[in-house]
Each structure stands twice: as C-alpha cells, then as structure tokens.
Curated annotation (Swiss-Prot):
UniProt source species: Drosophila mojavensis
Biased composition (Basic residues): 1106-1116
Propeptide part(s) removed at maturation, as residue ranges: 1114-1116
Name the UniProt record assigns to this protein: cGMP-specific 3',5'-cyclic phosphodiesterase
Disulfide bonds listed in the record: none
Function: Has a role regulating cGMP transport in Malpighian tubule principal cells.
Swiss-Prot/TrEMBL catalytic activity: 3',5'-cyclic GMP + H2O = GMP + H(+)
Stretches with biased composition (Basic and acidic residues): 1014-1023, 1067-1076
Length: 1116
C-alpha cells in the first residue's frame, strides 16, 4: 500500500480544473495500487507490511469539502461499496483502525496511521509492486482539494474506481467519534473484530429449514450467512416484549445453526437461591408464539443452578456441547419419555449481561441438515448471536419491570384514593387492599389481623379530651412490643380482635372476631403473633419447618393448605404495631421473593394509613355525635325556663330614665337581677328594635334570660359587666347621637354583641388559655376567648325559642350575624391595636362619611372597645369599686399561673404587687383609654363625658399612685372611705425599728440643710408641693398611726406643707414622749435624712428628747 500524507494550508492561487482532476486521479491510482498489493490474510493478522495513510486530524480528506459535498460523497461511497460487496460476496473484509490517543494539540502535528484493507480479492492476488507518493505530490493534492472542492466532488461521482471509494468510505467511518459509550456498540465491534471460522463454501439453509419457514420469512433463504446473521440481529434488536423476543431468538437460532428445536431459560431468585425458569420450551421453526407461551405457562419448569445441563451452564457460565445426550450423566431423559422425542446432540450456552452476570440459558437440540453434532462453527454462531440476544433480553426485562412498576404505581394510587373513599367503612377498605394485593402478587389467600382497635380508639379519645397540664393515667394501645416478657406474650393471644380473610377470586371477604381458643390453635395466628411481637417481616418458604423450629402447635387442617407465607407488621404513625398482614401461597407454588416483599410492604403501609385514617374518621364522627349530644344538653340547661320567661314577659318595664340608661354615669349596683333584664328589654324597646324586626316578645325575654344564665359567676366578666357595656353602647347611640351613623340592623347587632361579648368567660385571658394549651386554645388559635364568646352567642340563638333573628330575611340575617361577629372579636385588645392606626388616619384626614363597609367596621370596633372599657369613665366611687373587682379577678389568674404553670405572673396579676395597681391603672388609661376617647370625642363631640370622666379618674389614680410611692399601701376595702391602710398594732406596743425617709421638695432656702451642706436649687414646678415617704419596717403605736393618716390626707387636700409638717412634728413628739428610745438617731447628709430608734434593754443612758425633736424638725 502507499502512504498518502495530506496537510492543510491556506488557500492559494486557484489552478485549473484539469490539474485538480489529474491530482485526484493520481491519488486514486495510488490508493488502488496499494489495495491491490495487500493480501486479506495479512490485513487480518495486522502484518507489518501494511500500507498506511498518514494525515493530520485537522486535515482529513473530508475537511477539504463542504458539508453538502461530504454528504453526497458518503452517499456515493455507500452505494458503490454496497455494489462492490454484492459483486464480491465470497470475500471477507476486515477493517482495523488505530485512532490516535494524543491530545488535540499534538494531533495537529502527529500522523495518524490507518490500515485500509481491500475488498477486491482479484486486486489482492494481482498486486506486484508498491508506489509511494512524495511530499510534493501530497502538498499539490492538498492545495488543489482546498481550491477546487467541486472538482474532487465531480471526480468522486464520475471517475473514482469502486475500490478507492470503498477504502475512502472505510477511512472516513473510522475517523468518526462515537456519540456515547454503548454496550451494544462495544459488543458489535468485538464481534466484528473476532476471527471467523473458515468455511470452504457459503452455508445455505437446508431444504427442511426452508420449507419450515413461514411465508413472510421465505426471503431469508436468498441471503448468505453474513447477511442472514445481520438480518436476524435486526429482527430482535427493537423487540421489547419478552415472550415475543424469546420466541424470535429460538426460531432465529434454529435458522442459523440448523437446530431442530430449542429452549430458553431465564434466571430468577435471590443471590442465595438462584434458579432457572423455562420461558419457552421445545420451540421449533413452526411453533406458534401463542402455543409456545401457553405450553410454558401451563407447566412451569424450574431448574436450580448446578442441576442438569442447563443448571450447570448457569452455574459455571461455560457452554456445554454434547454429541450423544444419552451417554451424558447430566442429561434427563424424562422429557423424551413423555414426548417420544429422541435427543441426540445438545448445545447449551449461557446468556450474560454486560456485567457478566447470568440472565438466562439457551439450549438447542439436534441438527436438521444431516449432521449428528454441533460443530465449531455452530458454536461460534450461537455464541455471537446470543451476545446480542442478551442485550435484547435485558432491555426487554427492564421494559417489563417499568411496565410492572407503572401498574404497581397505578394500584397504589388507587389504594390512596380508596383510603379517602372508604374512610367511613374499615371493612370495605381492608377488603379492597387485600384484593389488590392478591391480584398483583398472585397469591391464593390474604389475611389481616387487627390489634385491639377499641382500646386504641379509647386512648385517642382520652388524648383529645385530656385536660392540659393535669397528670392523668394514660391508657396506651394494647400493641405488642418486643420487650414484653414471655408470660406477657403468652397472655397476648387475645390482642387480635378482628380478622379479615380473603380467599380465591370467587370468594368474598370474611370478617370475624376470633376467640382466644381460635387464636391459640391457628398456625396463621401464631405466625402473626410472632410478627406482631418482633415487629419484623417474615418470609416463610416451608411453614412446617418454621413451626418445628419455633415449637409452635400446628393445626392439622392447615398442614396441607399452607406452604409459603409472607407476613408483615402494620404500624401506625407512632411505629406501634396495630395489625399484621399475611399473604399465603403463591399461585405458582414458589416461595415469595424479595420483590414480592418490597411490593407487599407498600400494601402494608397503605393498609396502616387506611386503618389509621378510618379510625380517625370514626373517632371524629363519634366526637361530633357526642358534641351534638352535649350541645343539646347544654342548650336545654342553658336556656331559661318557661316560668322565668313568662314572669319576665308579664313584668311592667319602667321607662329608660328610671334606670338612668341615657346617662354615661349609669351604675348597676342598685339594680337587682330582674331589674337588669328589664333594663335590657327597655333598651331594645327604646331603639324600636322589637317592632322594627318583628321580634316576638316572649322570644326576646327568653333570649335575655338565657344570655344572663350563660355568664359564669366570675368577679368581673359577668352578666353585670355585659349590662354595663350594653348600656354604654345605648348611651352612645342615643345621648351621644351615634345612631345617626348606624342602620337599625347595625344597632340591633351592636346591642346583641355587647350583651354577648363575654359569654361563658372563665375569668382568664387569652394568654392563659394559650399557656395552658386548653381545648379552647386548640380550637381557636387567635382571639381565643372572643371566638368562644361568639360561638356561645350562636349556640343560644340556635337554641329552641331563642332566635330573636327568626323574622329576618336571609340577607339581613347574614348581615346582622356578620356585625355581631366583627363586634365581639373587636373586644380583643389585640384587634383594637391593629385597627387603631387605620381609624386614627381616617379621623386625621377629616373623615365624616362612615357609611363604607370598611369604615363602618372600624367605627363599630372602636365603639365596642370604648364600651368595653367604659368603667374607667364612671364616677370615682364606681370606678374605684370596679377596679377592685378587676384586680381580684386578675390576681386569681395569677394564682392559677403560679399553681398550674409554676411561673411568675405579670405585675397586674401578681397579688404580691397589688400596691402597684394605681400606677398600672394610670398606664392603662394613658395607653388605651385616653387616646381612644380623645379621638372619639374630637370626631363625635356628644360623647365628651366619657373623655372627661376618664381624665378625672386618671387624676385620682395618679394621686393614689403617688401615695403608694410614699410608702403607703393601697386600700384593701371595697369603698374609698378609708383610702389608706391602717397600721396594725396595739397602743402599748413598743417601738421597733422605725425608719423615716423624708424628701423636702418645698425649699425656700438655698443654703445647706441640717443634715449636711448640700446646695438645693429646687425647680420652680416642685416648690409648690411636698412628697413624704414613710417606709415601715416595724410597727408604730396606734395613736400616732391614726393621727398620722389623717394629717397626711388633710395635707394632700390642700393644707399648707408647713402646717402639715408642724402637725407631724407634734404627733411624732407626743409618741416619742411616751416611749423612751435608748439609741440615738444618725441623720445622713443631704436633703434626705434617716433616723432610727429601737428599744433596748441596755442601761447606757437616755437620749435628750428635745434634741431629737429638733433634729427631726430640721430634717423636715
């Protein structure tokens, strides 16, 4: 052969078309001569005398043409090569390609050597010399190719010899990179590179084989062996049906090897228990697919690895070629005896995947062309064809697995859908799950054991109704735990309370409650008991061996019926075993596989989900039924009696003025309970709501009495508080002229909301409900108590004879209920803070039209809050008493927090800090009340009394707060008669550790004080008042205590500080004259001095009383 080196260069001057053609012909002649002189055997053996064609990677011949030219050239080459192959069908052609492994940079300079054998045997035999092209020739050809690609294209199509085209085509194909690594491509290249078995003449189909072919495949007889081989590979290449593929493999192998019949076995089982299953058995050239599949499924043949000829091939991965079968000890003649067929020669070969693992075994029997054995050529053809068949079988198995997985997913989706469709019927749900499992896994029977569902349900109900933070003995589900003792396990026979059984396809599901005796004498129950105890999956291949191994009693009736069992626990969300699922006997008689266990696990999970969901649904239904019963009982007991209703309906209702309903200073202290109800009726009458909305008078009376009845007797948030809130709303509507901004329906809703806004109040706030995780906090996550109040309001309205909205139209009913709900929820101060800024923005913008839905909602919310805290604007005597009630209720909650939650309550709920209440009241007024009333009275000036009353009470609370800061404790009485707590003690009690702290705020002198030389420049606004703080660590005498209290309050009422100090001096002096303190006082420097006197038994001497008095006066 001739080396042809082509290098790339930039295009130079164009040359004539004739010169290009001459150069092309020269190159072609060189290629032809080289091919003619190279024998085929030397090419296959890679002889050293092979000619090479050297070219750089970036300067191949194809690079000199355009894309269109390359495409046309390839087509022409393929056509010419095909024609040449037909004309030279008796010769073999092998292509050896040695691609460069260097980097792209080195490839630009390093030559690539390609050995191109010729396909023309005549040329090979006539070669006699060798011609080498010079570098100058190569450069000239390269330049002409770059300048005249059209001339090269014309030469290729018109004048190129077939052998040159063939060699050029092979060279181009060898230079193409693979798109991706391909197992099929690697195997194909390996097969193509392997040496062929020399045959003296081409192998043709025998006459018997030709006549056995169906009409659609008669054309195969016209093909030689190579073409037939490739055609039969294409026949199985795209087949994904495993049955059709195996049938084609056996038929095609029979054609290639002239075998009479064949069988194909597929490998199954676990790594520790591998066996072969006959996919198709004894398939001939004329056997139809349907008949072959039916026969194989009717009698499944299973061969363990290492048993028989096929088993040995599967185990050793080595082919076995037997010339005389009956002389081989591994041959089993039972099939021949049954069928009357005589087996002579057997060729059995393994089928492996790309990893070398056995996926099947193919076996062919007897030759049909007169030969008595399978020769070496048959073995090679068989091996090569099975290489491709292995790829096809694995692809078909993967496809079959994907189809099965799709079916399984569809079944699981149906099961998931069934969980929600059958959630009200556990029996139907479990039956459907068992039916799907039986059909998918092909087993004879299914059963499901359930564990003590009643106890599980009771435990769940107890958890739902469990009181927060209360120690309660928990009942756990009677599930079987692995840590139970042997005696406990023996006593757990009665744990299975329900048994679901499903037999064959025509059998209905059976649901039973087995007794202890039934469970004790049932092998299936014992296995289920074992699984429930251990919580492990059990796959039993031989039940009898398992019973013997575990010393269990086997029921005689189950000895012959049960062979293999797959048993799996059913667990709930807490990983507790709530049941056991069983699959009994595969239809094929084989044990359950790991794949079966994996699928069955999904069924067990869905079964557990379904059981749990059904139980929850049933529990929810029962709880709702109980709730309905409880609501009926509550409705009956919460509704006012008929006698009370008739009595109230017959009472004479006084005018509004008699109850002082129009005034913002209304108080309920003087009203009896019946009067409170009459006052409510009068408010409805004065607003003309009874006649406007056609409210039956007896229904209104019953509703008012029922609302009063549903308030708990707490200290503040009780019925009388609701009455005061409703009266304030009435006064704002009438006296405050707010009714001009409201419709009659909204007035009705606001009054109802005021009366119901604290229904069933427990004396605790929302924060307490959340901290204790009460059922109310679980039911309502925000505005907990307010939502409960509204629900109670709805409950009373829905009670028989209490619906005061019964005459409203559906639209009006929805509107008034929306008003009631929004108004009640607005009493939550958290809602007030959310709405306040929006309301203030509207007021600051000068809003006067409040008829929009959002603006009306804001206005009603502000009015509800103003009414709810309106006690802060009552006269001081009323406000003081109400504040005492609020404080007592808060202190009760604080005590509960200490007791139940073991936490320190906030200051306003801490009984130990009750003296700080005046200060906290001032803060409450400044933060909530005054801003609200100020903006309301600025916009609606008719409600100014609320703002003024709040200001007055703030001054009173501030005054009392200052007294507390002076060291005096707040009152512990219901009235203001004795505003300062009396110091307890007796008149004759000795003086003990009295500590005085005096702060002088009214100083006219600018020099030093008696206690020190400190300069006191007092601000102007502090010179008109004095502050006196007395801290008591011991006890004073009774006389000085009473005089001191009166003096302090007289001084705070307006007497001059100097007079007060003189009185204080005289009282202290009188008391000191009566006592004889023995320890001198030690005044501190500055404007604050301290003096202590204590009684002592020491006789160290007496103290000058006049000196002591002068020091105290100087300090004051």
């Amino acid at each position: 052969m001739t080396d042809v080196s082509a290098t790339t260069g930039r295009a130079g001057d164009r040359v004539s078309s004739t010169s290009s053609e001459v150069a092309v012909e020269t190159t072609s002649q060189a290629l032809t001569n080289g091919a003619a002189k190279e024998p085929l055997a030397a090419v296959t053996a890679e002889a050293t005398a092979t000619a090479t064609v050297t070219a750089t990677t970036t300067a191949t011949v194809t690079a000199t043409t355009t894309a269109a030219t390359a495409t046309m050239a390839t087509a022409v080459i393929s056509k010419q090569a095909k024609s040449e192959c037909h004309s030279q069908s008796n010769n073999n052609q092998h292509v050896e390609t040695a691609p460069s492994k260097q980097s792209s940079d080195s490839e630009a300079s390093a030559p690539t050597t390609v050995s191109i054998p010729s396909a023309n045997a005549k040329i090979n035999s006539s070669s006699s010399g060798k011609t080498t092209a010079t570098q100058q020739d190569v450069d000239e050809v390269a330049r002409l190719f770059e300048e005249k690609p059209e001339a090269f294209e014309k030469w290729l199509t018109e004048r190129a010899p077939p052998e040159a085209l063939s060699r050029l085509h092979e060279f181009i194909e060898s230079r193409k990179p693979h798109k991706r690594p391909s197992v099929t491509s690697d195997l194909f290249q390996q097969w193509m590179a392997s040496p062929t078995v020399q045959q003296k003449s081409p192998r043709k189909l025998s006459n018997s084989s030709v006549h056995a072919l169906p009409e659609s495949r008669r054309h195969l007889m016209e093909l030689d062996e190579g073409e037939l081989f490739m055609e039969l590979i294409r026949d199985v290449a795209n087949e994904l049906d495993i049955d059709v593929l195996c049938h084609k493999i056996l038929v095609n192998v029979g054609l290639l090897t002239h075998a009479d019949r064949g069988s194909l076995f597929l490998a199954k089982g676990t790594p520790n228990n591998r066996y072969l299953v006959a996919k198709l058995f004894d398939v001939t050239q004329t056997t139809a697919l349907k008949d072959a599949v039916t026969r194989a499924r009717a009698e499944e043949i299973i061969i363990p690895f290492g048993i028989g000829i096929a088993g040995m091939v599967a185990q050793t991965k080595q082919m076995i070629n037997i010339k005389e079968a009956y002389k081989d000890a591994r041959f089993n003649c039972e099939i021949d005896l049954k069928t009357g067929y005589t087996t002579n020669a057997i060729l059995c070969m393994p089928i492996c995947n790309y990893e070398g693992d056995i996926i099947g075994v193919a076996q062919i029997i007897n030759k049909t062309n007169g030969c008595m054995e399978f020769d070496e050529h048959d073995v090679e053809i068989f091996r090569r064809y099975l290489t491709f068949c292995g790829i096809g079988i694995q692809n078909a198995q993967l496809f079959e697995m994907s189809v099965q997985e799709y079916r399984r997913n569809q079944i699981l989706l149906n099961l998931a859908r069934s969980i929600f469709e059958e959630q009200n019927n556990l029996e139907c749900l479990v039956t459907k799950i068992m039916t799907e499992a039986r059909e998918l896994l092909k087993c004879e029977r299914c059963s499901v054991f359930l564990v003590d569902l009643d106890c599980c349900e009771e435990s769940h109900l107890e958890k739902i109704i469990e009181k927060p933070h209360q120690l309660q003995q928990q009942r756990t589900p009677r599930a079987i735990m692995s840590g139970d003792s042997f005696e406990e396990k023996q006593n757990m026979r009665n744990r299975f309370t329900v048994l679901f059984e499903l037999g064959g396809e025509n059998h209905a599901a059976n649901v039973s409650r087995p007794s202890i005796n039934d469970l004790s004498h049932s092998t299936l129950a014992q296995i289920a008991q074992f699984v429930a105890t251990t919580g492990q999956t059990v796959n039993i291949c031989d039940v009898q061996d398992w019973v013997r191994e575990h010393n269990q009693i086997r029921a005689e009736s189950e000895i012959d019926s049960t062979q293999a069992i797959l048993c799996m626990p059913i667990v709930n969300a807490q990983k507790t075993v709530i049941g056991v699922a069983q699959l009994i006997n595969k239809a094929s008689g084989l044990p359950f596989t790991e794949s079966d266990a994996s699928i069955f696990e999904a069924f067990a999970i869905f079964c557990g989900l379904g059981i749990h969901n059904t139980q929850m649904y049933e529990n929810a239904c029962k709880l709702m039924a109980k709730q309905k019963v409880a609501l009926e009982c509550l409705s009956y007991h919460a509704t006012a009696s008929q006698d009370q209703t008739e009595k109230l309906a017959q009472d004479v209702i006084a005018e509004a003025e008699a109850y002082n309903l129009y005034s913002f200073t209304f108080t309920d202290f003087d009203l009896v309970d019946d009067d409170t109800c009459r006052a409510v009726l009068r408010m409805f009458m004065q607003c003309n709501l009874v006649s406007q909305f056609h409210i039956p008078y007896d229904v209104l009376c019953r509703w008012v009495l029922s609302v009063r009845k549903n308030y708990r007797p707490v200290k503040y948030h009780n019925w009388r508080h609701a009455l005061n809130v409703a009266q304030t709303m009435f006064a704002m509507l009438k006296t405050g002229k707010m009714e001009r901004f409201m419709t009659d329906l909204e007035i009705l809703g606001l009054l109802v909301a005021c009366l119901c806004h604290d229904l069933d109040h427990r004396g605790t706030n929302n924060a307490f409900q959340t901290k204790t995780e009460s059922p109310l906090a679980i039911l309502y996550t925000t505005s907990t108590m307010e939502h409960h109040h509204f629900d109670q309001c709805v409950m009373i309205l829905n009670s028989e004879g209490n619906n005061i909205f019964q005459a409203l139209s559906p639209e009006d009913y929805r509107s008034v209920m929306k008003t009631v709900e929004s108004a009640i929820l607005s009493t939550d101060l958290a809602m007030y803070f959310k709405k306040r800024n929006a309301f203030l923005e509207l007021v600051e913008n000068g809003e006067f039209d409040w008829q929009g839905e959002e603006k009306k909602d804001l206005l009603c919310g502000m009015m509800m809050t103003a009414c709810d805290v309106s006690a802060i604007a009552k006269p001081w005597e009323v406000q003081h008493r109400v504040a005492k009630l609020v404080a007592d209720e808060f202190f009760d909650q604080g005590d509960l927090e200490k007791l139940q939650l073991n936490t320190q309550p906030v200051a306003m709920m801490d009984r130990e800090r009750k003296d700080e209440l005046p200060k906290m009241q001032v803060g409450f007024i400044d933060v909530i009340c005054l801003p609200l009333y100020r903006v309301l009275c600025d916009t609606f000036p008719w409600i100014t009394p609320l703002y003024e009353g709040t200001l007055e009470n703030r001054r009173n609370w501030q005054d009392l707060a200052e007294k507390v800061e002076m060291g005096l404790t707040w009152i512990d009485h219901d009235t203001i008669d004795k505003p300062v707590e009396e110091f307890a003690g007796c008149a004759d009690e000795e003086i003990k550790d009295i500590e005085f702290t005096v702060t002088t705020l009214n100083c006219n002198q600018h020099g030093g004080s008696a206690g020190g030389g400190e300069d006191t420049h007092t601000p102007e606004h502090q010179r008109s008042s004095s502050r006196l703080s007395i801290k008591k660590t011991g006890a004073l005498g009774k006389v000085v205590r009473s005089k001191l209290s009166k003096t302090l309050y007289n001084s705070m009422d307006g007497s001059k500080p100097k007079t007060s100090l003189k009185l204080l001096e005289s009282h202290v002096s009188e008391d000191m004259d009566d006592k004889s303190p023995t320890s001198p006082s030690q005044p501190h420097s500055g404007s604050v001095g301290r003096m202590s006197a204590s009684s002592s038994t020491s006789s160290a001497g007496t103290v000058d009383k006049s000196k002591k008095r002068s020091k105290l006066c100087a300090l004051l």
